[in-house]
From Swiss-Prot:
Pfam families: Peptidase_M35. Keywords: Cleavage on pair of basic residues, Disulfide bond, Hydrolase, Metal-binding, Metalloprotease, Protease, Secreted, Signal, Virulence, Zinc, Zymogen. The active site is at residue 317. Its EC number is 3.4.24.39. It is found in: Secreted. This is Neutral protease 2 homolog MGYG_03465. GO terms for molecular function: metal ion binding; metalloendopeptidase activity. Disulfide bonds join 196-267, 274-292. Binds 1 zinc ion per subunit. Belongs to the peptidase M35 family. Its cofactor is Zn(2+). The keyword Repressor does not apply. It comes from Arthroderma gypseum (strain ATCC MYA-4604 / CBS 118893) (Microsporum gypseum).
Length: 371
């Protein structure tokens, strides 16, 4: 792929895009109720309120088994920082093990410890709530066909800080990791070379370069193509557009160097976050990005529209880092149809919208130039 030449042409791309239909979305299909079942233990009861079977994908929802951001935790009106992981999952060839099947009016319960992903050692009164989008497939299928939004009740909890402090953090650093990370920060190192072999270092550096060029091109396209911006971010509001452009420019700057920046990048995992289907993940509390083994199975840069590759995965993860752009992006939805179904306020704060927009600009250009 002649990437530089293609991106040079991208700056002139202003052709309007055809309208894309929304994926079906239902705001009343899934009900989520939170209850306290211990000092910092929360039980989520998820109920299918519809009249047909729901096959619900667990990734980055309140049903996710990984230490992802399932709830928002507030104390005195201020959100308690999240200390868990923000992963990007491999979304192709999904299998049944990653879905939860619920008949009509049936419920499933999922229990998790909020102290494992939040520092609650201060103790006292906290308010917990959950909101998100569940990708759904039809019964006996793993093809995502719709999305169900959910908003939970507000749960008020009185937390014993001493007990909360005794809960092990899900993404806790080992002494070795603490030392490596401290040295990297002291040297302002972007890629931690000790986490890489020759092949993974080359791939990661290549991904950084491609991420920088993609983000730059997407920033230009955001200002030049209002139809495309509306398609991916659900608005053409001037303030929202400026936020998106600023975030893409920040990602481009952060991606432009392998040995300086505000994030620390690991070619391999030593914290146990590379669970099944995780391509890469970010710890926003530490501005740290980790590539997983299957990241290196992705193509460096794909021509396939809305497919995943190394470059857009790196771009996706950088949007999760508050040092790159604040507020950092969340994982409200995955995949093109789900992302363009988000309301505008969430679309401009959703990491995959940025990755898809960057990929879509490049992919659409190939179609445009080859036709």
């Amino acid at each position: 792929m002649q990437f530089v030449a293609v991106l040079a042409a991208l700056g002139a791309l202003v052709a309007p895009a055809a309208a894309y239909p929304h994926a079906p979305m239902n705001e009343t299909l899934v009900d989520v109720q939170l209850t306290a079942v211990g000092n910092t233990m929360v039980k989520a009861t998820i109920t299918n309120k519809g009249d047909s079977v729901l096959n619900m994908l667990q990734f980055n929802t309140i049903m996710d088994e990984n230490p992802t951001r399932k709830v928002m935790v507030f104390q005195d009106g201020v959100e308690v920082p999240f200390t868990g992981m923000m992963p990007r999952y491999l979304m192709s060839d999904l299998t049944e093990e990653f879905f939860t099947t619920l008949p009509p009016q049936a419920s499933v319960e999922h229990t998790f410890d909020i102290a494992a992903t939040h520092d609650l050692s201060a103790g006292g009164k906290y308010v917990i709530s959950a909101s998100g989008a569940v990708p759904t497939a039809e019964e006996h299928s793993t093809t995502i066909t719709s999305t169900a939004l959910y908003e939970s009740n507000e749960l008020h909890m009185e937390v014993d800080g001493v007990q909360a402090a005794a809960v092990e953090q899900a993404m806790n650093f080992t002494p070795e990791m603490q030392s490596i990370h401290a040295r990297a920060l002291e040297k302002r190192t972007k890629i931690v070379s000790g986490s890489c072999n020759q092949n993974t270092l080359r791939a990661t550096m290549n991904a950084l370069g491609n991420s920088a060029r993609l983000a730059q091109a997407a920033s230009r396209a955001a200002s030049q193509n209002p139809r495309k911006f509306q398609e991916y971010f659900r608005t053409n509001d001037a303030n929202a557009k400026q936020r998106v452009i600023a975030r893409l420019n920040s990602v481009a700057r952060e991606s432009s160097s392998a040995n300086a920046g505000v994030t620390t990048y690991y070619c391999s995992d030593t914290m146990g976050g590379c669970k099944p289907r995780v391509l890469a993940y970010t710890l926003p509390s530490r501005n740290l990005v980790v590539n997983c083994p299957i990241y290196y199975n992705l193509p460096p840069l794909t021509k396939q529209c809305h497919a995943q590759d190394q470059a857009t995965t790196t771009l996706h993860e950088f949007t999760h880092n508050p040092a790159v752009a604040s507020p950092h992006c969340q994982d409200y939805a995955y995949g093109y149809q789900q992302c363009i179904s988000l309301p505008a306020a969430k679309a401009v704060q959703n990491a995959d919208n940025y990755a898809l927009f960057a990929n879509g600009m490049l992919s659409n250009l190939f179609v445009f130039t080859l036709n």
